[in-house]
């Protein structure tokens, strides 16, 4: 890994409308007007006060420099409550269209305009899966969308980010804007106290290009920080595990491990005599 430095500082004048806290961001590569651009979406604390709002900054390189649009692109909840956080962007491989998803206490989605800097207001859709409980699929936050074999998979996190019970559930749709059909066995990833694995959620998904090999990336609470009152504070660690599908397209429950799921050379084959420093 190489530290490329700060890509965007919300405490500086780089983002005039916000005062700190680039919360739960995501980045998307998209060709615009014949040139690849990198779009960094984030939730910031508005200078004027109130709840978080979603902004976007743009660069010609994934390491920046990024330039903020100058104003937020999502300012209010479409349902009158919840927070405008946990943004995700999905580009549909079928249509080439890009979609923005966000929300805490609700899930919203909308098609992005071709410039990737605003949404098509008439496409804004509330997608919140109905029902469920904290034991299974009651929606809290962290929507994530991917496509496989004609289905759009919607994943989300259940319970609170600081809870050992924080976990991942999912559903599917025939459209990137729903409606979502919750899976019969919706829980994909959940705590395993016997292995001292707690709060595994707020995930993303990776597909090895050209294969049907998939991985789920998420964070979980370090076992020594599970008691926030007695412990030194929240400490989360980034993890990755293999994610597999049944023949009918349903996702098999992920079994989290402490050991590595693959090596660097497994993903990116190295020429002979190459050395990887870790």
Descriptions of predicted regions:
Residues 1-278:
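Carbohydrate-active catalytic/glycan-binding domains of CAZyme proteins
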């Amino acid at each position: 890994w190489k530290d490329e430095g700060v890509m965007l500082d919300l405490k500086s004048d780089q983002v005039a409308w916000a005062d700190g806290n680039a919360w739960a961001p995501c980045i998307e590569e998209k060709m615009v007007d014949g040139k690849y651009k990198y779009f960094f979406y984030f939730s910031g604390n508005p200078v004027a006060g109130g709840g978080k709002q979603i902004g976007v900054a743009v660069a010609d390189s994934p390491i920046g420099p990024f330039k903020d649009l100058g104003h937020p692109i999502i300012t209010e909840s479409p349902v009158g409550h919840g927070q405008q956080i946990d943004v995700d962007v999905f580009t549909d491989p079928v249509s080439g269209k890009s979609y923005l998803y966000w929300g805490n206490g609700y899930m919203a989605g909308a098609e992005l305009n071709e410039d990737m800097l605003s949404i098509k207001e008439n496409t804004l859709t509330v997608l919140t899966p109905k029902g469920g409980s904290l034991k299974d699929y009651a929606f809290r936050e962290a929507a994530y969308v991917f496509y496989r074999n004609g289905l759009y998979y919607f994943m989300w996190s259940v319970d609170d980010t600081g809870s050992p019970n924080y976990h991942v559930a999912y559903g599917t749709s025939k459209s990137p804007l729903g409606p979502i059909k919750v899976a019969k066995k919706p829980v994909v990833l959940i705590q395993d106290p016997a292995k001292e694995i707690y709060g595994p959620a707020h995930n993303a998904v990776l597909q090895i290009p050209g294969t049907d090999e998939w991985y789920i990336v998420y964070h979980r609470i370090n076992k020594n920080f599970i008691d926030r009152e007695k412990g030194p504070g929240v400490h989360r660690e980034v993890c990755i595990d293999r994610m597999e599908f049944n023949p009918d397209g349903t996702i098999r429950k992920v079994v989290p491990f402490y050991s590595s799921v693959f090596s660097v050379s497994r993903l990116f084959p190295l020429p002979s005599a190459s050395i990887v420093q870790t």
